[in-house]
């Protein structure tokens, strides 16, 4: 119904807008979004294309989005769209780097840049990447929420300040395309999280439940594509919907500080941890053929809890160092927002 409504509505171009860039920007945003979605497999045998460097391909496509967003805001010749475009470009740039470093850590741990092979790695290791690199999973979810500009990172579209942000001047099907692109990127984020951290199309406890008489064969008959869809739907429901209804919008300076000062060092830390895990916890010559790991976890006799414990230790040290600065030093930063005199404390005539 909404699609038909947008389709029949009139599309108008602002009088002094840069018409070419104004018209091209929505198609640039939607096309890059569809390119990401086209790289995501539903199972080991159901996919549109399967290049060996599919993770690198996704990293490259993600870098195009800020360009289209800024062009859309700038070309409209509107102060609200320009402010929204600048906010969006700054936010996407700040969170793009931690996202790319997180994807790089996934490739380092799994030893491949191919999405399907990274899913097979989790099956062979006998553990999802969610448990092998919990910090990476948290970083991926946070950065993807910021990438799709969902609550609480929706400051570029703040209705109370900027009407509709950088897509204020778009109407008709162009507005519908931008609206569609936002949700497609959200669904693509859920699918990518499913493949990178939740084992993709492999069932949970597949080896344990699969060995149960009568129940096991029926359990293993569940199609892999259905498993992926259910996992992605649960990620969308638990993460994106919960965040939308539970969290409040945060200021632009807080968004940028959180991305540059907290997520970026944590992403670099995750890359280092992934390299250590790959070199010392897994056999670099290849994974075992058994479901539960074999050489994967017996290479040095290291227990399964090592990734979780080392992540917690490094996080504790990081936050201790992060909070070492005093309050006066933090408030002296040029981007810190403070109120010298609280509003409403003066009586009329006493300003």
What does each model-identified segment do?
Residues 1-351:
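Selective transmembrane helix interface/packing segments
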């Amino acid at each position: 119904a909404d699609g038909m409504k947008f389709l029949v509505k009139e599309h108008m171009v602002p009088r002094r807008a840069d018409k070419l860039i104004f018209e091209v920007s929505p198609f640039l945003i939607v096309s890059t979004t569809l390119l990401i979605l086209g790289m995501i497999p539903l199972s080991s045998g159901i996919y549109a294309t399967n290049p060996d460097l599919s993770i690198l391909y996704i990293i490259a496509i993600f870098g195009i989005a800020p360009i289209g967003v800024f062009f859309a805001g700038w070309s409209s010749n509107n102060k609200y769209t320009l402010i929204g475009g600048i906010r969006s470009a700054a936010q996407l740039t700040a969170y793009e780097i931690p996202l790319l470093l997180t994807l790089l850590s996934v490739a380092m741990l799994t030893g491949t840049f191919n999405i399907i092979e990274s899913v097979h790695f989790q099956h062979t290791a006998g553990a999802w990447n969610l448990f092998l690199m919990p910090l990476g999973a948290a970083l991926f979810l946070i950065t993807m929420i910021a990438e799709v500009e969902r609550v609480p990172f929706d400051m570029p579209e703040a209705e109370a300040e900027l009407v509709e942000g950088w897509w204020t001047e778009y109407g008709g099907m162009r507005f519908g395309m931008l609206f569609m692109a936002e949700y497609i990127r959200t669904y693509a984020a859920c699918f990518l999280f499913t493949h990178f951290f939740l084992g993709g199309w492999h069932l949970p406890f597949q080896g344990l439940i699969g060995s149960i008489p009568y129940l096991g064969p029926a359990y293993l008959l569940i199609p892999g594509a259905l498993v992926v869809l259910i996992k992605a739907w649960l990620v969308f429901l638990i993460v994106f919907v919960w965040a939308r209804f539970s969290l409040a919008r945060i200021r632009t300076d807080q968004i940028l500080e959180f991305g540059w000062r907290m997520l970026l060092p944590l992403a670099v830390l995750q890359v280092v941890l992934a390299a250590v895990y790959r070199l010392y916890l897994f056999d670099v010559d290849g994974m075992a053929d058994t479901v539960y790991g074999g050489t994967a976890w017996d290479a040095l006799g290291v227990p399964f809890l090592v990734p979780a414990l080392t992540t917690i230790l490094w996080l504790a040290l990081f936050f201790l160092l992060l909070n070492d600065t005093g309050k006066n030093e933090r408030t002296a930063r040029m981007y810190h927002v403070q109120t010298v005199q609280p509003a409403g404390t003066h009586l009329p005539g006493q300003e």
